[in-house]
Amino acid sequence: EQMKYNLTDDRVFGKMYYGNLVDFIDEDKLEEAQNKIKEQKESVIVYGVGAGLVSHGDVYVYFDMARWEIQLRYRKGMANYNVDNYDEDILKKYKRGYFIEWRIADKHKEKCFECFDYVVDTNKSKDPKMISKDTFKISLHQLSKQPFRTVPYFDPGVWGGQWMKEVCNLDKDQSNYAWSFDGVPEENSILFDYDGITFELPAMDLVLYQPKELLGEQVYSRFGAEFPIRFDFLDTMEGQNLSLQVHPLTEYIKKNFGMSYTQDES
């Protein structure tokens, strides 16, 4: 019910949620959980979304996952947070994530940067990896000062062609590839090498943790901790005609979707 206004009745379009994780927390139950922990004589593990609101404890671990991996898990039947919508239309799952869950999670994550002791890469199921807070911070600080690229991902679509399949050495069993998301920090990830071990973080971590260093003062002052450019490539070779891309004016996108800026394509 609390999300109804932002979810809307539309299959794809929603409205941005600008609240916080605490908006969905029952204060009485939170206090009850905190009191239970205080009463315990032995070690207690608190886990789950917003566990840090209950207690930071002696060791605070943040579990991280890129949004592309989240989308892939939606397709495999994973539900949105705290909702039994396992079989729901993937576009509706994505809408709930894009307009509500990811906004809340980003705000919560920003507050966690100075609190957690370790970060866990959960992008590969049953193969988690962990780094310390210091390693996390040093890595992102260094990255903000040098050239880098995000991990691309490819997806089929209505107009999809065959060119990327050959040039990028992609799965030949796929019917086509329409999209190559090559520089969309909100959804792409970044790979780090630590003594031969590959560690994956959402590229949004860099945007949120080092926004001024990454974007520059002028861009940051206009857009805040968001990456306002999306680099993606479309393949129609031996495919269908590209769909007509229509983007609203700034006033319209603010009024109807709660978004602070629009986009143009070239």
Indicate residue ranges for each PLM-predicted region.
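Generic secondary-structure transition motif, activating predominantly at the C-termini of alpha-helices
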Residues: 25, 38, 74, 78, ...
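ATP-dependent NMP and nucleoside kinases share a basic, alpha-helical "lid"
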Residues: 31-83
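Glycine-rich loops and low-complexity Gly/Arg-rich segments
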Residues: 68-73, 84-89, 143-147, 256-259
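Transition-metal
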Residues: 116-121, 125-266
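Small-molecule kinase domains that catalyze NTP-dependent phosphoryl transfer to phosphate-bearing small molecules
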Residues: 51-52, 76-138
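Generic structural signal of hydrophobic/aromatic residues within well-ordered alpha-helices
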Residues: 3, 21, 30-37, 70, ...
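ATP-dependent small-molecule kinase phosphotransfer cores
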Residues: 1-43
